[in-house]
Amino acid sequence: MSLALLVGVSGSVFAQKKGFDYKFYGQVRTDLFYNTRSNSETVDGLFYMYPLDENLDPNGHDLNGVGNGNFYTLYTRLGVDVTGPMLGKAKTSAKVEVDFRGSGTTYSLFRIRHVYFNLDWGKSALLVGQTWHPLYGDVAPEILNLNMGAPYQPFSRAPQIRYRFTSNNFMLTAAAIWQSQYLSVGPKTNKPGETSTQKSQEFMKKSCVPEFYLGVDYKRPGLIAGAGLHVSSITPRTQSETEDAVYFVNERVTGISGEAHVKYTKENWLVSAKTVLGTNLTQTSTVGGYGITSIDEVTGKQQYSPLRTSS
């Protein structure tokens, strides 16, 4: 069980200079939470995902049956939307938004949420920068909790190059996506059979292949319906440290995921649904990972099988 208290204050300021329009916005947010037991979580318990299983000591007491709570203002945020001059036939715009989340276990520091520019030619648009991961999409739970439905709903903001084409009521989205704050999980060391894990950018960097997303949406007033396909490929290790030597290894874990969504709104109510078949989507705050299926007896090179989940 968790309890959240939200106090928001938002506003906007307009300015204009040499063909640019600026709209400043922000909010003051406070979060008071209490959890009845230990959980899988981030941000010191503020970003709740799911309760941890029982872990009994010799006396039968649950080590995870301990409550916790705190009060934070980390998600107070500031932002600016910029509308720029025409660039050829394209309308230009940009966004910068930050909060005080920090990174890892270092809190109360500026953190980038959204930073991108967008070129809009009418039917087609190109976005370059960091914004919501395409798997987050236009259909997500509307709740006070910061996790927005994770680990069932993918949650991530990621650097990307995204192209959208709109014709009549249909919109095609194609994106190449990298990782920055929300990362893949991999082995903590290069020893064969290592099961301790860590989150790191190295697994995607060494892969040299971004994530790819392709989706289609049907939109009309009050209705959104669509589906998307996502592919990711990471490199867990490039070296294997055996007892005798250090070997170069070429390892890769590739996963294909899919999602479908629908949202209908009318006057003061809405109905929405979304399903995700995910393969190793730890970088989107969902349940994921992969297991070792075989280990080479000489080099320690490992084969893997990704974890698939459905929500």
Which stretches of residues belong to each language-model region?
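Bacterial Sec-dependent N-terminal signal peptides
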Residues: 1-17
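Outer membrane beta-barrel
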Residues: 17-44, 54-183, 208, 213, ...
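Detector for outer-membrane/organellar transmembrane beta-barrel domains
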Residues: 222-311
